[in-house]
């Protein structure tokens, strides 16, 4: 019974789970992540790639797969420390919304957007994807789906479908 009860990934529980994993000292993540704090798989084109190069390869690959066009609206679900959203904004003329449930990641992302002078192009919010009611031309989510929980897959994909414009593209990793 307890396992069944705790497997529900309701909004409040999701925020608690994220806080438990990500709202801790950033010094820990600095020990093993690349300088942009990407916390998902990397794309090593060859064995000589450093972790940082492989993470940048991943971003470039994602941007290519999204087939981004100028002035599109992009949603990054589970934006983490904001790297993907910031790089999309920096490399395209798209407006990007990154959402996270982590207070630390939100503050870090907003600070990076300010440092990179991208505040007018990228926005970060402390928000659950289930609470959004906007349309996006592109939706990307890297390394977040594993936190959704099997019982919420249908809700997740229905929400992505609802948020995606009719001719939009979603990339879920």
Predicted features by range, described:
Residues 167-173:
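Conserved beta-strand signature within the Rossmann-like core of class I S-adenosyl-L-methionine
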Residues 1-31:
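N-terminal auxiliary segments of SAM/dcSAM-dependent transferases
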Residues 109-110:
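Conserved SAM-binding loop
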Residues 81-92:
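Conserved SAM-binding loop of SAM-dependent methyltransferases across substrates and taxa
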Residues 140-145:
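A conserved beta-strand element that flanks and buttresses the S-adenosyl-L-methionine
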Residues 130-139:
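A short acidic, Gly/Pro-enriched loop at the edge of an enzyme's catalytic core
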Residues 71-78:
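Conserved class I S-adenosyl-L-methionine
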Residues 154-167:
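A short glycine-rich, Lys/Arg-flanked "PGG" loop and its adjoining helix->strand segment in the class I
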């Amino acid at each position: 019974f307890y396992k069944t009860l705790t497997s529900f990934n309701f909004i409040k529980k999701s925020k608690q789970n994220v806080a438990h994993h990500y709202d801790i000292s950033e010094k820990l993540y600095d020990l093993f992540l690349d300088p942009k704090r990407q916390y998902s798989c990397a794309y090593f084109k060859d064995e000589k790639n450093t972790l940082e190069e492989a993470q940048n390869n991943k971003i470039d690959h994602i941007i290519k797969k999204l087939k981004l066009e100028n002035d599109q609206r992009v949603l990054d679900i589970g934006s983490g420390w904001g790297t993907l959203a910031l790089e999309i904004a920096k490399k395209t003329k798209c407006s990007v919304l990154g959402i996270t449930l982590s207070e630390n990641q939100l503050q870090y992302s907003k600070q990076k957007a300010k440092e990179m002078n991208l505040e007018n192009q990228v926005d970060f919010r402390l928000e659950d994807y289930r609470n959004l009611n906007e349309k996006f031309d592109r939706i990307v989510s890297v390394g977040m789906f594993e936190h959704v929980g099997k019982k919420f897959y249908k809700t997740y994909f229905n929400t992505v479908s609802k948020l995606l414009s009719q001719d939009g593209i979603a990339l879920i990793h």
